[in-house]
Amino acid sequence: MMIMRKKHPLIKLINHSFIDLPAPSNISSWWNFGSLLGVCLMIQILTGLFLAMHYTSDTTTAFSSVAHICRDVNYGWLIRYLHANGASMFFICLFIHVGRGIYYGSYMLLETWNIGIILLLTTMATAFVGYVLPWGQMSFWGATVITNLLSAIPYIGTTLVEWIWGGFSVDKATLTRFFAFHFILPFIITALVLVHLLFLHETGSNNPSGLNSNSDKIPFHPYYTIKDLLGVLLLLMVLMILVLFFPDILGDPDNYTPANPLNTPAHIKPEWYFLFAYAILRSIPNKLGGVLALILSILILAAFPLLNYSKQHGLAYRPLTQFLYWVFIANLLVLTWIGGQPVEYPFTTIGQISSVLYFTIILVLMPTANAVENNILKLH
């Protein structure tokens, strides 16, 4: 008689995804971040659920309800900081996961890559509406500035912004709907993750060599379950160090001041994980142009499969494109730094140069390097 895990309709799904799944024998630790993202998502949903039990989405009580969670709820401070810093860990894993996909050419698994881009956008939307909920100064002004960008859309812009706000400014209606969005979106993300995995398991995983690994597969369990478990322990260690020793290091001090529509903070900026896109937005003097650049800074990921002219899979044996890749990563870090700086010389100029470089590397330099490498290696 066949063992239950191979026969039971539900358990066999888990078996095919996490136990008997044939995986390449040579995938490195860069492949750990998918499972780490799953763990981050579970942490966020669980801590978020407990926070939602005590939070009130009303402009008069939202700020004090967060203070109440931290002061009066048993381990409320821990749940709140796990949720806030868990979001940062989520984005660190997300950026590394995408970066690995670019480096090793995983974008050639088209359906998986495109669902991944949708996941990235959905996660960014979730984080944005979540940041508004504590109703501090930066929550309020961040919501005002970012939603106001939609007014740049010709003809329908102003109407659209007021429709999203539920009035003529960011107010009670906005906070209530943002809470509703923040509650529902993680479950949509979970559904998309399942679709992401479904498409990945249709083709099988990529590997560092970029070669077909069908002739050399090993079972996911125990090899990669143990490897993933080590990654999870390291992730939890870093998260707990952040939460217990430096809970506010990634936050903004302005968010400890209750929202005040009559007093604008000196420097309005989003959370650190949006700063690169914010820098690109600010580097264009025209409002509509800035909004388009902001959207394209993420959607440009969809262009990677179209701009890949290389005859080799991944960058493991392509030093020219490898160099450009690391310049691209360094440029992203520069953009992140610029996004957190005031709008004045020399930061504006550095931001503009970095923004141009961001798009130039992806659209011009990398495809050119692909063609040059093909030519050098006589891969026609």
Swiss-Prot record:
GO terms for MF: metal ion binding; ubiquinol-cytochrome-c reductase activity
GO BP term, example: mitochondrial electron transport, ubiquinol to cytochrome c
InterPro entries: Cyt_b/b6_C, Cyt_b/b6_C_sf, Cyt_b/b6_N, Cytb/b6-like_sf, Cytochrome_b, Cytochrome_b_C_euk/bac, Cytochrome_b_N_euk/bac, Di-haem_cyt_TM
Regions that span the bilayer: 33-53, 77-98, 113-133, 178-198, 226-246, 288-308, 320-340, 347-367
GO cellular component, as recorded: mitochondrial inner membrane; respiratory chain complex III
Annotated binding of heme b b562, by residue: 83, 182
Superkingdom of this protein's organism: Eukaryota
Co-factor requirement: heme b
Keyword DNA repair included in the entry's annotation: no
Membrane disposition: Multi-pass membrane protein
Compartment(s) of residence: Mitochondrion inner membrane
Alphabetic keyword roster: Electron transport, Heme, Iron, Membrane, Metal-binding, Mitochondrion, Mitochondrion inner membrane, Respiratory chain, Transmembrane, Transmembrane helix, Transport, Ubiquinone
Residues reported to bind a ubiquinone: 201
CDD domains the UniProt entry points to: cytochrome_b_C, Cytochrome_b_N
PROSITE patterns the UniProt entry points to: CYTB_CTER, CYTB_NTER
Residues that coordinate or bind heme b b566: 97, 196
Cofactor binding, note field: Binds 2 heme b groups non-covalently.
Note: Heme 1 (or BL or b562) is low-potential and absorbs at about 562 nm, and heme 2 (or BH or b566) is high-potential and absorbs at about 566 nm.
Self-association and partners: The cytochrome bc1 complex contains 11 subunits: 3 respiratory subunits (MT-CYB, CYC1 and UQCRFS1), 2 core proteins (UQCRC1 and UQCRC2) and 6 low-molecular weight proteins (UQCRH/QCR6, UQCRB/QCR7, UQCRQ/QCR8, UQCR10/QCR9, UQCR11/QCR10 and a cleavage product of UQCRFS1). This cytochrome bc1 complex then forms a dimer.
Role: Component of the ubiquinol-cytochrome c reductase complex (complex III or cytochrome b-c1 complex) that is part of the mitochondrial respiratory chain. The b-c1 complex mediates electron transfer from ubiquinol to cytochrome c. Contributes to the generation of a proton gradient across the mitochondrial membrane that is then used for ATP synthesis.
Family: Belongs to the cytochrome b family.
The protein's name in its UniProt record: Cytochrome b
Origin species: Thomasomys notatus (Distinguished oldfield mouse)
Gene this protein is translated from: MT-CYB
